[in-house]
């Protein structure tokens, strides 16, 4: 079987680099080949694009360095998106990035939602903020989200075994979406 290459776009909504949000998404990306053996990964890091985003009020006037990232999002086969929790929501520039995305381009695209925060009390941000944002785009948000608090990290790297188990559940849903059987150790 000659499977097609899956275009994966990872959006890290943190305003800092390095960040725990990037660490969580990186842990997911590192395990993704277990279910998607042929993939292309494109990273969109808000921390690196903040000046371009802040200066782009409309899609037509978006800066030249921002355009390839917007096009990658609009052409993605799979989105992995994450943001730190700021005042019970995602970062403003994360939202602004998606304000510039064509509102019809994500219809039916699977999206893995992820967030990081100071404590577990912010975990509902995934369902109360991120999921409705992608519902607007008519994207297919996968049922398991990833939320990790400060205790799950060693510096900026994910270190909590329970989080790696959650990533495995997320990967199962990704594999199911693309009709790829997931082989697990007994």
From Swiss-Prot:
It comes from the Bacteria. The keyword Metal-binding does not apply. GO terms for molecular function: FMN reductase (NADPH) activity; oxidoreductase activity, acting on NAD(P)H, quinone or similar compound as acceptor. It is an enzyme of class 1 (oxidoreductase). It catalyses: FMNH2 + NADP(+) = FMN + NADPH + 2 H(+). Signal peptide: none annotated. The keyword Nuclease does not apply. Its EC number is 1.5.1.38. Keywords: Flavoprotein, FMN, NADP, Oxidoreductase. Belongs to the SsuE family. This is FMN reductase (NADPH). It comes from Pseudomonas putida (strain ATCC 47054 / DSM 6125 / CFBP 8728 / NCIMB 11950 / KT2440). The gene is msuE.
């Amino acid at each position: 079987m000659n499977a097609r290459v899956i275009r994966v776009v990872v959006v890290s909504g943190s305003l800092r680099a390095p960040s725990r949000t990037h660490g969580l998404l990186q842990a997911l990306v590192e395990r993704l080949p277990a279910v998607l053996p042929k993939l292309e990964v494109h990273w969109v890091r808000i921390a690196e694009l903040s000046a371009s985003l802040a200066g782009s009020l409309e899609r037509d006037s978006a800066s030249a360095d921002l355009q390839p990232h917007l096009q990658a999002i609009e052409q993605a086969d799979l989105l992995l998106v994450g943001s730190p929790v700021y005042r019970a929501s995602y970062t403003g520039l994360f939202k602004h990035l998606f304000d510039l995305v064509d509102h019809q381009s994500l219809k039916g695209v699977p999206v893995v939602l992820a967030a990081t925060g100071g404590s577990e009390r912010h975990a509902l941000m995934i369902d109360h903020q991120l999921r409705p944002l992608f519902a607007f785009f008519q994207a297919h948000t996968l049922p398991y989200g990833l939320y990790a608090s400060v205790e799950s990290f060693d510096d900026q790297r994910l270190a909590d075994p329970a989080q790696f188990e959650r990533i495995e559940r997320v990967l199962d849903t990704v594999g199911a979406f693309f009709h790829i059987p997931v082989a697990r150790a007994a």
